Amino acid sequence: MFSRGNQAAAMLLVLLSGLAAGAGYAAQKVQGWGKVSMHGAIIDTACAIAAGSRDQTIDMETIPLGQIIRDGQGMTKPFSIELVNCILERPGNKSDWKFFQVTFDGYAEGSLFGVQGDARGVALKINDSSGNVVIPGEPLPMEEIIPGNRTLNYSMTLMPNHQPLKAGAYFSTVRFKLDYF
């Protein structure tokens, strides 16, 4: 009825059909399942930093070179760090939390934060909401810890750095840390 070649082909077709049907059945069984992964940390600090504040990207936008020359600076963009679940009490014999300091760090260019990329002649200046200029690596003045949640507001401005200006894309990474006392 079937030649040896046709018998082998027919047998292979039957086996593959069985595998495909089994895979379809297995896929139907698994569709009702899922997985949730999580992570977190327990910290010994007065406040936690809100998830949306830990890793931010600020779009400084595209501006004409002439605007920096005319205005003496580029655009200013606001950003903030949200502190959550702040407490004053510490467990055990440790003294209560009272103050904190914020320190920003990154590629320093004098009192400014340097940029990388094709653009030249510019750097970034950061100010806090009290008008204090943020110097890379130097802590800002101490502030009192207030229980609950709190938003720390800052602004970032593109500034000339007294080098020849050159158009191009730029980027920078600025890290921050909080120390509690």
Which residue ranges define each predicted feature?
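Mature extracellular/passenger domains of Gram-negative fimbrial/pilin and adhesin proteins
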Residues: 2-7, 12, 22-181
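Short, Gly/Pro- and small/polar-rich lid/capping loops
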Residues: 18
